[in-house]
């Protein structure tokens, strides 16, 4: 029996093995059994074990390194998550704020588009063109997230009349804070004959009294004596522009005075930076010992030599050659070329700016009109104070926190036009810098000036005047600045407003033709209020962060001001109305 194995092709049987001729069946000697154990194929066992140990150690080290790397990777992920979480939270707040801003901007654009459509429709119809121009000129906007306000003659008075009209003439349901309440009580106590002209019974705040108080605050920055072709506000803006053009870099010159008004925040930022970089200590007051005690103007038209020159703003204007040196600073005659090569020591850049931007063909030499110069420096100081008060203000806080609610007394307010924050946005999230002030000058100051060319700063911002008048003065007198500070809480602040109460009483008496007060008495009372306002400006400018100080000390609560939104409206209107129940 034969078996055929295809792998080896071997035929076997009962007899001898046969090897058929095949490529796999070749003749070769027997293979040595211990061939692969020869020394040539084997090495020292100790060397092999050592190499194995080295390889094992390397593998263990690599494993440990991989384990450490894995642990570090986990810790890095945890650390990154820990650091990213607060950033993500801030980004969420910023995204919310940006969404609110976009909503407000969209609403403002819709409102502007609607207004443009309405104006264009009237223009196309060709009817009442002059009325439309007058109406649009009397439209202002104080904050970005509120609609336009249209007024007749005086924004503060017109809005006040609307407040009382919507309260159905129940005067006791409208309050303006403890400051105005104190003024009215002082008037009733000191001038009972004048008090009969107002309705103060039953705890009411008289509309007549509030209107008179606001107009008195607005008047304290005006010069009642002398004929002048330029207002203090115009002179202040010209000085700011001339200083910016003289000392600034990358200057953009305005094409007209209206564009200069819109650029005032830029000029103020530049002036503030230059004053802060100077080595000398800043002084925002005059030498009161050399000035008249009870009048703003001097009987002879000039103050004592050196009375105004210590003021930091005036010193900066003179040192930068925006204004020429004051009287007596230089001898008469020309200065030698070695000292003044350009012979421009007596050039007046403000007069040149007035000719270029206003073109009234009237010279403007402030150094020759010292009362106007003093009023101009006061206006620049007030503008710097306004710049500090409105820096980084947050108008997008939750509306329910604002005491000033436009929809409470202005009918027909569209909710989409009064956009507030959807959440309570923290004040440190929104950094507005000077954008709210820039908007205020573009949409409030410029339209106001376009309507009334000779308008003064105090007419635009009576609330800032009230803040200056509310600064407590030292017990040494109104003009005493060297009295030491005492830790005494003064609850008799009514006596410091005696000048304002006197001016209000005179204005109320002048409303009756039967009792016409003397002009001299009115001017004297007006000057006393102006001097007190000047003193308050100096005191508030000594504070680096006046808004924070006023909020921390609760001074603003006396005017019904609780938020930055309230503060901006209070500065522009002079009051914050609050409607209360009369039950």
From Swiss-Prot:
Query: Which residue ranges does the record annotate as region Interaction with major capsid protein/MCP?
Result: 1-49
Top-level division of the source organism's lineage: Viruses
Q: Output the InterPro entries linked to this UniProt entry.
A: Herpes_UL25
Q: Does the keyword Transport apply?
A: no
Q: Which UniProt key words apply to this protein?
A: Capsid protein, Host nucleus, Host-virus interaction, Viral genome packaging, Viral penetration into host nucleus, Viral release from host cell, Virion, Virus entry into host cell
Localization in the cell: Virion; Host nucleus
One short Pfam name that applies is Herpes_UL25
GO terms classed as biological process: symbiont entry into host cell; viral genome packaging; viral penetration into host nucleus
Gene Ontology CC terms, in alphabetical order: host cell; host cell nucleus; viral capsid
Tell me which family the UniProt entry assigns to this protein. Belongs to the herpesviridae CVC2 protein family.
Oligomeric and partner information: Heterodimerizes with CVC1. Interacts with major capsid protein/MCP and triplex capsid protein 1/TRX1 at the pentamer vertices. Interacts with the large tegument protein/LTP.
HAMAP family associated with the record: HSV_CVC2
Function comment: Capsid vertex-specific component that plays a role during viral DNA encapsidation, assuring correct genome cleavage and presumably stabilizing capsids that contain full-length viral genomes. Participates in the interaction between the capsid and the tegument through interaction with the large tegument protein/LTP.
Task: Indicate what this protein is called per its UniProt record.
Answer: Capsid vertex component 2
Q: Which organism is it from?
A: Gallid herpesvirus 2 (strain Chicken/Md5/ATCC VR-987) (GaHV-2)
């Amino acid at each position: 029996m034969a078996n055929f194995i295809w792998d080896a092709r071997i035929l076997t049987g009962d007899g001898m093995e046969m090897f058929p001729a095949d490529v796999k069946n070749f003749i070769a000697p027997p293979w040595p059994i211990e061939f692969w154990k020869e020394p040539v194929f084997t090495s020292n066992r100790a060397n092999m074990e050592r190499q194995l140990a080295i390889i094992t150690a390397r593998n263990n080290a690599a494993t440990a390194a991989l384990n450490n790397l894995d642990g570090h990777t986990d810790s890095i992920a945890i650390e990154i998550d820990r650091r990213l979480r607060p950033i993500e939270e801030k980004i969420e707040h910023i995204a919310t704020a940006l969404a609110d801003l976009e909503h407000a901007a969209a609403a403002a654009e819709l409102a502007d588009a609607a207004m443009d459509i309405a104006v264009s429709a009237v223009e196309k119809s060709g009817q009442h063109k002059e009325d439309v121009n007058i109406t649009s000129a009397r439209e202002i906007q104080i904050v970005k997230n509120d609609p336009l306000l249209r007024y007749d003659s005086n924004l503060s008075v017109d809005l006040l009349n609307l407040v009382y009209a919507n309260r159905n003439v129940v005067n006791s349901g409208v309050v303006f804070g403890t400051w105005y309440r104190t003024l009215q009580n002082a008037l009733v106590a000191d001038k009972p004959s004048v008090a009969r002209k107002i309705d103060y019974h039953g705890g009411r705040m008289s509309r007549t009294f509030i209107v008179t108080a606001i107009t008195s605050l607005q008047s304290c920055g005006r010069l009642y004596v002398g004929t002048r072709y330029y207002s203090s506000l115009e002179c202040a803006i010209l000085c700011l522009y001339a200083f910016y053009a003289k000392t600034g870099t990358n200057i953009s010159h305005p094409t007209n005075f209206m564009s200069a008004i819109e650029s005032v925040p830029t000029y103020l930022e530049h002036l503030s930076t230059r004053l802060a970089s100077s080595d000398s200590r800043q002084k925002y007051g005059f030498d009161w010992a050399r000035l008249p005690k009870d009048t703003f103007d001097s009987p002879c038209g000039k103050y004592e030599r050196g009375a105004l020159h210590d003021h930091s703003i005036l010193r900066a204007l003179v040192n930068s050659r925006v204004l020429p040196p004051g009287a007596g600073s230089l001898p008469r005659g020309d200065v030698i070329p070695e000292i003044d090569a350009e012979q421009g020591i007596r050039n007046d850049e403000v007069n040149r700016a007035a000719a270029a931007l206003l073109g009234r063909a009237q010279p403007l030499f402030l150094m020759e009109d010292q009362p106007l110069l003093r009023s101009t420096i006061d206006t620049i100081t007030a503008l710097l104070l306004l710049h500090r008060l409105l820096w980084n203000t947050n108008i997008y806080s939750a509306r329910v926190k604002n005491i000033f609610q436009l929809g409470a007394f202005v009918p027909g307010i569209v909710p989409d036009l009064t956009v507030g924050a959807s959440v309570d946005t923290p004040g440190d999230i929104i950094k507005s810098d000077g954008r709210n002030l820039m908007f205020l000058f573009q949409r409030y100051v410029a339209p106001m000036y376009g309507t009334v060319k000779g308008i003064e700063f105090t007419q635009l911002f009576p609330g800032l005047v009230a803040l200056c008048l509310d600064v407590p003065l030292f017990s040494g007198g109104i003009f005493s600045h060297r009295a030491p500070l005492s830790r005494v809480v003064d609850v008799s602040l009514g006596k410091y407003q005696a000048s304002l109460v006197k001016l209000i009483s005179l204005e109320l008496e002048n409303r009756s033709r039967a009792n016409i007060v003397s002009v001299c008495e009115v001017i004297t009372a007006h000057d006393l209020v102006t001097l007190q306002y000047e003193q308050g400006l100096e005191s508030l400018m000594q504070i680096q962060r006046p808004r924070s100080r006023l909020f921390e000390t609760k001074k603003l609560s006396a005017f019904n001001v609780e938020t930055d939104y309230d503060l901006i409206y209070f500065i522009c209107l002079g009051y914050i109305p609050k409607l209360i129940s009369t039950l």
